[in-house]
Amino acid sequence: YVLEQLAGPEIPQSLFTAVDVEGEALSRATTIDKIQLGTGMFKGLGTGGDPERGRALAEEHIENMRALCREQDVVFVVSGLGGGVGSGVTPLLARAAKEAGALVLAFVLTPFTCEGTRRQKFARESLSELKQIADGVICLPNQQVFKLVDERTTLVDTFRMTNGLLAEAVRGVWRLLMHKGLIEIHFSDLAAVLRGSQSESFFAVAEANGANRVDSVIRKLFTHPILLESDASGPTSAALISLIAGRDLTMAEVNKVMAEISGRYPGAQIIMGAAVSDDFKDRLSVTLLVSHQMAVESEAPTPGPASSQETPVLSTSPRMTQELSSS
């Protein structure tokens, strides 16, 4: 699960809530707050891959979800789309957080092609609905991970890799919002890049140290499989760049990073931030988010839900929520 890969000192576990229909999956979650769906209507029997059933299960707990999100400035919803829980519950969670007054960012995975057209359809519908609700959506298609694996990579390792990439995005945005910098990026800046029902967003996080850390970070960013996919999607409309380093960060390093990235995305609106932290002594970390405005199709997909690793998570400074199952 993505939740397991986010565990660590950087993001306190007290900020996580795990949501699932399966009691066994919840018992393995290390979060303090947990919501088990289906204890009433379906008594923990799952969703059978049906998003409408997942939505019905979540409706039973909607007040509980709103209560968790009250007095939270920002809520991260982390989920896999495609199945009953991810597709049915994720948009409802996002709506509950919005109704509680929080700003909402969704981080989602979509299914591999081999998972079938049914799960892909549910994922597309859920993603479309999420874009109408959340302040920003970052989506990682699992299919892109095939660029990183070979024919000997096991199924378990492949899913671990996709979860790791999504966790990387969550940590990158967390740092961006939590490290108050010399040049700050505000939530409104982030939402401006990610918002829009007809936009598609891509991300990469890279880190390096040593004398050539800028060159190394740029190389890692520009060869990141998700950004390579972004380049194939057409002109970039906006790019957000966040740099975090120790007190040894120089103006020349900042200028070089910005020049390289701005040169790669000519014509894009550029938003940048820079922070120094003693936790990043001798290290340079760069988070890059880019957004494309997609052509409007004549027939929009019907809004609805979808997932491949499914566990919504609710989040406060920000608070996080993840769905855990693949039902």
Regions found by a protein language model. Name each.
Residues 1-327:
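Tubulin/FtsZ superfamily GTPase core signature
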